[in-house]
């Protein structure tokens, strides 16, 4: 599977999640023996999210994922045979502030030193900066099926998009040409 961030047409299309997001949270909480109901209550979110009676926006989805990672004590959310220690993402995000260029910051964001492998890279192609996630050799945990991996790769793309937007302090939809997502099963591209 390869994911490439090159663009996104309209960031507003990413404001509401589908039923897959809720189902993923429920499955993850169950597999980790964590109460999703308690997490929703602690975060002040309506419990009707579980029954899909109220929408779940992406910000709240990522807040719930963060809380699950704390409960599980693994920022990879049980996806890797090499769990990520709590604080890993905060460490990487804090380190971005010291970078002098957006290119250097995006290269730091690639997380390679944490994942112990060359799964992410940043390339300059003509005048385009390309962030590539290549997880072909990533040490996925045995319980990670292809659908779950694809779902999480899409979330990684959204997360990286948000981080880059924060770094330049502006929506990046105007600066990016396309978002491309490929797996062995499917290919999705937004222009």
Q: Which ranges hold each PLM region?
A:
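Alpha-helical bundle regulatory/interaction domains
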Residues: 101-191
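N-terminal low-complexity or simple alpha-helical regulatory segments
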Residues: 1-132
């Amino acid at each position: 599977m390869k994911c490439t961030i090159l663009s996104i047409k309209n960031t507003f299309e990413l404001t509401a999640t589908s039923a897959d997001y809720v189902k993923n949270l429920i499955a993850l909480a169950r597999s980790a023996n964590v109460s999703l109901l308690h997490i929703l209550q602690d975060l002040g979110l309506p419990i009707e999210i579980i029954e899909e009676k109220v929408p779940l926006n992406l910000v709240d989805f990522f807040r719930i994922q963060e809380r699950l990672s704390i409960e599980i004590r693994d920022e990879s959310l049980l996806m890797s045979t090499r769990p990520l220690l709590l604080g890993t993402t905060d460490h990487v995000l804090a380190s971005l502030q010291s970078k002098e260029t957006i290119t250097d910051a995006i290269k730091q964001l690639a997380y390679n030193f944490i994942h112990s492998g060359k799964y992410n890279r940043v390339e300059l192609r003509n005048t385009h900066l390309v962030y590539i996630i290549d997880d072909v050799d990533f040490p996925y945990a045995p319980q990670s099926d292809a659908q779950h991996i694809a779902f999480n790769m899409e979330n990684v793309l959204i997360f990286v998009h948000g981080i880059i937007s924060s770094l330049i302090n502006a929506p990046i939809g105007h600066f990016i040409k396309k978002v491309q997502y490929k797996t062995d099963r499917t290919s999705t591209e937004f222009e």
